[in-house]
């Protein structure tokens, strides 16, 4: 959180539940007046990777189109963008939905999480497996040096 809202953390028990929660949040954001082109979904995985909760997902028409890696178009058109964390490094968006998190402790995971979680200008929403709650709590404590 820099100048924006409090970070939202969302636990899930299955990829299906994660997908449902992500789509529900997108609907809520759209109903609150956030435009599709302000929303970026980040994942360690490509959307065509079975590890992504959006793999083979049918996206309801009220949510609109989700496009992959639309560089140079961050402020145009009316669609939600999907990037891998590595592809989005150095870029920013008003709203970031960070999905498909594998962990919080491993050095590679921590670096990937840092890159993803530092991309939001206003709102960051983080989706992680419920069994990672203890790791997330440790990460939070360590980041505050407690």
Regions found by a protein language model. Name each.
Residues 1-146:
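Core RecA-like ATPase module of SF1/SF2 helicases and allied nucleic-acid translocases
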């Amino acid at each position: 959180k820099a100048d924006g809202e409090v970070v939202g953390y969302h636990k899930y028990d299955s990829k299906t539940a994660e997908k449902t929660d992500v789509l529900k949040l997108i609907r809520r954001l759209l109903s609150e007046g956030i435009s599709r082109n302000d929303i970026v979904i980040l994942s360690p995985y490509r959307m065509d990777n079975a590890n992504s909760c959006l793999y083979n997902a049918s996206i309801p028409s009220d949510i609109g189109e989700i496009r992959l890696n639309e560089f140079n178009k961050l402020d145009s058109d009316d669609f939600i963008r999907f990037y891998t964390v590595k592809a989005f490094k150095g870029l920013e968006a008003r709203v970031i939905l960070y999905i498909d998190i594998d962990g919080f402790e491993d050095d590679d995971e921590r670096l990937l999480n840092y890159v993803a979680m530092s991309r939001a200008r206003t709102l960051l929403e983080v989706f992680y497996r419920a069994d990672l709650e203890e790791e997330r709590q440790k990460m939070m404590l360590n980041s505050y040096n407690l």
